[in-house]
UniProtKB/Swiss-Prot annotation:
Pathway: Nucleotide-sugar biosynthesis; UDP-N-acetyl-alpha-D-glucosamine biosynthesis; N-acetyl-alpha-D-glucosamine 1-phosphate from alpha-D-glucosamine 6-phosphate (route II): step 2/2; Nucleotide-sugar biosynthesis; UDP-N-acetyl-alpha-D-glucosamine biosynthesis; UDP-N-acetyl-alpha-D-glucosamine from N-acetyl-alpha-D-glucosamine 1-phosphate: step 1/1; Bacterial outer membrane biogenesis; LPS lipid A biosynthesis. The lineage of its organism: Bacteria, Pseudomonadati, Pseudomonadota, Betaproteobacteria, Nitrosomonadales. It comes from Nitrosospira multiformis (strain ATCC 25196 / NCIMB 11849 / C 71). GO terms for molecular function: glucosamine-1-phosphate N-acetyltransferase activity; magnesium ion binding; UDP-N-acetylglucosamine diphosphorylase activity. Gene3D superfamilies: Hexapeptide repeat proteins, Spore Coat Polysaccharide Biosynthesis Protein SpsA, Chain A. This is Bifunctional protein GlmU. It catalyses: alpha-D-glucosamine 1-phosphate + acetyl-CoA = N-acetyl-alpha-D-glucosamine 1-phosphate + CoA + H(+); N-acetyl-alpha-D-glucosamine 1-phosphate + UTP + H(+) = UDP-N-acetyl-alpha-D-glucosamine + diphosphate. PANTHER family: BIFUNCTIONAL PROTEIN GLMU, NUCLEOTIDYL TRANSFERASE. It is found in: Cytoplasm.
Length: 460
């Protein structure tokens, strides 16, 4: 098999994006457009991947920061042909070069493999699509007798008859390296744009007797580029719809497939149910029977079987055990591990803590930097006071502890097995096991006490 070189053109300005951010760094499904393209390129196992950048300067390579890539600036930007010229020192004399675009994020690996398979030492492969309205795109001109590709004519240089052609060039092509060097050197810029068009090498291929083969993607949107926020939003919906359909085909129950956002990888077991307006970021795994309530955000989370995440919960970088109950309005922060049958209720925040099986914090509490044993009850309003303004400290709550409401645990502190903490206590020292511990001021009732009376407002 011929060595594969990939060149990604990512130097465009993106004027219609109306943004200081380089176009290829705008996010789709939570990651930059260019990263989508590079992930696809990586799946093809190329010998080299060269990225041509320009507008935005070093912002693009600094943001991506991938040492396996070859970054080459294009200054000034004089067209697609000129862009590929910049990569020539990094392209071998033999093999195939696949040309991709940093603002065309959804081309599938399968489509590109099909295109690459068509290309060879004597064949140039083009990815084309038929559009009902081809305005603005380069047209594929074929010989009237043989049907073979003769040339690609850009919109601004096309005749009236050529503009009626519905087959358009997507820009994605696989070119034999043995010809690429020579063809690029012959490019001229005597066109309406004054640019060096990469598409002109197609006519050169025909002239040199190199076959020009065409392939089509499974879906037209695989070759759709982004030039505006409108197009970006449209591709976002296309991507999310495709992801939702995959989940449905796997047996996941979605309350509304149009109202789910996947910004990473979502893996689901059997009988998983997802309500509306949920967002999944990073690597999320939902095991069998998990139910996710509406308006929930999960990021880099594993949720074990039969657990329920109630609406409006936020969980990130955490591990949730079997048959847990989370929320509504719960926040679980990074470093948290909940074992089986743990309950975290409304307006409870847990950070960098481990809760053993059967423990509960059902209302209005903060558990930070804590280790909580089995079958512990955390009363409403309990706070682990873990920060002294400079350092964080750990709270340890052993098995079978009952913590009364409105308790402050001043870390570092240990609550021993079987302890009961009276409501309203501030615990500053370790507690003994199997005893009631409380710290309160003595309750007083003052006879004859009068409430303050508001002073009358002065008259104007």
């Amino acid at each position: 098999m011929s060595k594969l070189n990939i060149v990604v053109l990512a130097a465009g300005l993106g004027k219609r994006m109306y943004s200081a951010l380089p176009k290829v760094l705008h996010p789709l499904a939570g990651k930059p457009l260019l990263v989508h393209v590079l992930d696809t390129a990586r799946a093809l196992a190329p010998h080299t991947t060269c990225v041509i950048y320009g507008h935005g300067g070093e912002t693009v390579p600094q943001t991506i920061a991938d040492e396996s890539l070859i970054w080459v600036p294009q200054i000034p930007q004089l067209g697609t042909g000129h862009a590929v010229m910049q990569a020539l020192p990094h392209i071998e004399k033999e093999g195939i070069t696949l040309i991709l675009y940093g603002d065309v994020p959804l081309t599938s690996v399968e489509t590109l493999k099909k295109l690459i398979a068509m290309a060879g030492k004597q064949t140039l492969g083009l990815l084309t699509v038929e559009l009902p309205d081809p305005a603005g795109y380069g047209r594929i001109v074929r010989h009237s007798e043989t049907g073979e590709v003769a040339a690609i004519v850009e919109e601004k240089d096309a005749s009236e008859s050529q503009r009626s052609i519905g087959e358009i060039n997507t820009g994605i092509m696989a070119v034999p390296n043995r010809y690429l060097h020579g063809w690029l050197c012959k490019l001229e810029n005597n066109n309406a744009q004054g640019e060096y068009y990469l598409t002109d090498i197609v006519a050169m291929a025909v002239k040199d007797g190199v076959k020009v083969a065409t392939a089509n993607p499974a879906y037209v949107w695989e070759t759709t580029g982004v030039n505006s926020k409108v197009q970006l939003a449209g591709l976002e919906r296309i991507y999310q719809t495709a992801q939702a359909n995959k989940l449905l085909e796997q047996g996941v129950a979605l309350a509304d497939p149009a109202r789910i956002d996947i910004r990473g990888k979502l893996s689901c077991g059997r009988d998983v149910m997802i309500d509306i307006n949920c967002i999944f970021e990073g690597d999320v795994q939902l095991d069998d029977g998990v139910k996710v309530g509406a308006h929930t955000i999960l990021k880099d989370v594993r949720v074990a079987a039969d657990s329920v995440i109630a609406p409006f919960s936020l969980i990130e970088a955490a591990e949730i055990g079997r048959n847990c109950r989370i929320g509504p309005y719960a926040r679980i922060r990074p470093g948290t591990r909940l074992e089986d049958e743990v309950h975290i209720g409304n307006f409870v925040e847990v950070k960098n803590s481990a809760l053993a099986a059967g423990s509960k914090a059902n209302h209005l509490s903060y558990i930070g930097d804590a280790v909580v044993g089995r079958s512990v009850n955390i009363g409403a309003g309990t706070i682990t006071c873990n920060y002294d303004g400079a350092n964080k400290y750990q709270t340890i709550i052993e098995d079978d502890v009952f913590v009364g409401s409105d308790t402050q645990l001043i870390a570092p502190v240990r609550v021993a097995r079987g302890s009961t903490i009276g409501a309203g206590s501030t615990i500053t020292r370790d507690t003994p096991p199997d005893m009631l511990t409380l710290s309160r001021a003595k309750q007083l009732s003052i006879d004859g006490w009068k409430r303050p009376v508001k002073k009358p407002k002065p008259k104007n």
